C-alpha cells in the first residue's frame, strides 16, 4: 500500500495533476488516487488472461480509502468500485490508515529538510514560527552541544521529529483500538473515525508545520516560477496527443479508442504515466522548445 498509493501521480507532481485535471475536465477530470487504481486493475498487463496485477480486495480497498471514506468517487474510482465493490463509505483497514499517516510524516519532515537545503527558509525562521520544530531543535542541540555544523544537525532534527511523531502515533492508535475493543478489521472499518492517527495535541502542532511549509516552500516564488511551465508541458502534451492520437507510440496508438470520453481518458493514461524527463523530451518532439530546462 505504501509503495502503490503514489503510482497515479503524473509528471511534475501536483502541478502536473492540476494541469491534467483541467484538460480532462470535459471527460470527468483526473485524480491521481483513481488513476493508481486504474493502473493496478486495468493498465498493467502482466497476465495472459486478464488485465491488472491481480491484487487482493484488501489492497484495492486500501488504495481507494487510505485517506478516509469516499462519498462522491470520480469516474476512475467508480469504475473500479463497480467491478470490485469497495464499501467506499466506510474507513479502510489499519494497514491503509498507517500507510496514509506514514506518508504524511515522511512528506512533512523531508520537505522541511529540502526547504532548508534549498535556502527557502532557515532554522531560525522555522523555529520562531513552529513550536514543535523549536522544541525538537532544542533537544537536538542539547544532545549534540559540540556540533556546530548545521548540515549534520538538520538530519538529526528530522530524525527527532519523526521519532516523536511515530511514538505519538503508536500510543494514539493503541488507545483508539482499546476504546473500540477491536477484535477484527471489521471493527476498525465500522469505528466511524480514523484509528491510526496522531493525538489531537500533536496534530495541532503538526498543522502549524504544514502551514509554514505551505507558505514558505510550496508557495515560494522560486517554486511558483516552475509551476506554470510544468503545467504548460502537461497541457501541451495532452492537446497534441488528443488532437492526433496517431502520434502516440506503438500499442498506445493502436489501441486508442475513437469515441469520447474513452479517447481522452486513454490519452490521459499515457500522459499520467510519463516521467518528468520523458515528458520534456516528448514535448520538444511534438510541440516545440520546452518552457522548462531539460532534467
Where are the regions that the model predicts?
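Aspartate-rich (DDxxD/NDxxD/DxxxD) Mg2+/diphosphate-binding motifs
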Residues: 1-26, 32-33
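Histidine-centered, transition-metal-coordinating active-site segments
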Residues: 15, 30-34, 39-295
